[in-house]
UniProtKB/Swiss-Prot annotation:
Keywords for this protein: Repeat
Organism of provenance: Arabidopsis thaliana
PANTHER family, per the entry: OS02G0611400 PROTEIN (PTHR46862:SF2), OS07G0661900 PROTEIN (PTHR46862)
Protein's UniProt name: Pentatricopeptide repeat-containing protein At1g19525
Any Pfam family: PPR
Highest taxon listed in the record's lineage: Eukaryota
PPR repeats: 9-43, 44-78, 79-113, 115-149, 150-184, 185-219
Family from the record: Belongs to the PPR family. P subfamily.
InterPro entries: Pentatricopeptide_rpt, PROP1-like_PPR_dom, TPR-like_helical_dom_sf
Length: 316
C-alpha cells in the first residue's frame, strides 16, 4: 500500500485538515477531510476537533456542531475545548437555540456541574437573544453553584434588561450584588451610562461617568457615541464637541451603526456642519447609511446652528 502512495496521501490529507482548519479555510479543510474518509480511514477525535474548531474560526458553528453530532453517533467523545468553542460562537452571535443545544450536549457528556465560563456564556447568549428570563435563571444557577459573576457577566445581564427597558429589574439586581459584596466595573457602568443617555437622564449618566473615573479608567471609546448623542440631544455645545472630538480622532474604529447614530443625533441637535462632516467620513469608509439617515441628510437644517452648526452657547 505504501508503494501505491496510499499512506502518503492519508498523511497529506491529515496534515491538510489540521493546516486549513487552523487557518480558518473551511472549504479546503472540508475537501481534505472528505479525501481522508474516501481512503476508508475513520477520522479520530483530533481530526474531528480540528475540523470543528476550523468551522468555528470561519464563523460556521452550525457546521461544526453537525460534525460534533457525527462524532457522538460514532461514539467518539468531544473535548471540553470543542464544546466551549461552539458555545462561545453561539454566545457571540446571540444564538439562544444553538447555545441550548450545546448545553444539552454538555450536560449529557459531563457528570459534574458546568463551569463558570459556560454559565456566563449562556447568560450572554440568552441575553442577546432577548430571552431575559433564561439569562437570569442561568445567572442565578451559576451563583447557587458558588460562582462569583465577573463584570462582563453582570454587564450582559444588565444589557438584557436594557433591551426590554426593565430598569427596575436591573436596579434590583445591582442592589442585591452590592449587598452580597460584589462590585461592578467599567463594562457594567458603560452599559448603564448608555442606558441613562438613551433615556435622557443626563445627571444620572454623569454620576456613573464619575464612578468610571474613580476606577481609574477613561470612558471607553464606544461610550463616546452615547455621550455625543446625549449632549447633542439637549444641545450642550461644549460637551457635544468634546465627545465628537474623541470620535473624530478615532473614527477608524467606528462602524456603520455608530456613524448612523451619531450623525442622526447631530442633525436632530442642529449641529449641521458637524453632521455633514461625519457623513463624509462615513461615505469615505464606504458604509451604507440607513434609509432614515439618507432622508435626514436631504432635509432642511434645524433652527439651532443652521449656519455653522454651532450658534448659541450653553452652560456645561
Amino acid at each position: 500500500m505504501s508503494q501505491n502512495g496510499i499512506f502518503p496521501d492519508i498523511l497529506t490529507a491529515t496534515a491538510l485538515v489540521h493546516m486549513y482548519s487552523k487557518s480558518g479555510n473551511f472549504e479546503r479543510a472540508t475537501e481534505a477531510f472528505e479525501n481522508l474518509k474516501s481512503y476508508g480511514l475513520r477520522p479520530d477525535e483530533k481530526i474531528y476537533e480540528a475540523m470543528i474548531l476550523g468551522y468555528v474560526n470561519a464563523g460556521k458553528p452550525k457546521l461544526g456542531e453537525r460534525l460534533m453530532k457525527e462524532m457522538q453517533a460514532k461514539e467518539l467523545k468531544a473535548s471540553e475545548e470543542v464544546y466551549m468553542a461552539l458555545l462561545r460562537a453561539y454566545a457571540q452571535m446571540g444564538d439562544a437555540n444553538g447555545a441550548a443545544g450545546i448545553s444539552s450536549s454538555m450536560q449529557y457528556a459531563s457528570d459534574g456541574p458546568l463551569s463558570f465560563e459556560a454559565y456566563s456564556l449562556f447568560v450572554e447568549a440568552y441575553g442577546k437573544a432577548g430571552q431575559v428570563d433564561k439569562a437570569k435563571s442561568n445567572f442565578d444557577e451559576m451563583r447557587k453553584l458558588g460562582h462569583k459573576p465577573d463584570d462582563k457577566c453582570i454587564a450582559n445581564l444588565v444589557r438584557a434588561y436594557k433591551g426590554e427597558n426593565s430598569l427596575d429589574k436591573a436596579l434590583r439586581l445591582l442592589l442585591q450584588l452590592e449587598k452580597d459584596g460584589i462590585e461592578i466595573g467599567v463594562i457594567t457602568y458603560t452599559v448603564l451610562v448608555d442606558w441613562m443617555a438613551n433615556l435622557g437622564l443626563i445627571e444620572e449618566a454623569e454620576q456613573l461617568l464619575v464612578k468610571i473615573s474613580q476606577l481609574g479608567e477613561a470612558p471607553p471609546f464606544e461610550l463616546q457615541v452615547s455621550l455625543c448623542c446625549m449632549y447633542s440631544g439637549v444641545r450642550n455645545e461644549k460637551k457635544t464637541l468634546q465627545a465628537l472630538g474623541v470620535l473624530e480622532a478615532k473614527r477608524d474604529q467606528m462602524g456603520p451603526n455608530e456613524f448612523d447614530k451619531v450623525i442622526s443625533a447631530l442633525k436632530r441637535g442642529g449641529f449641521e456642519k458637524d453632521a455633514r462632516r461625519m457623513y463624509k467620513y462615513m461615505e469615505a469608509r464606504k458604509f451604507l447609511p440607513s434609509q432614515r439617515l439618507q432622508m435626514d441628510m436631504v432635509a432642511p437644517p434645524r433652527a439651532f446652528g443652521s449656519g455653522s452648526g454651532r450658534v448659541r452657547r450653553f452652560n456645561s
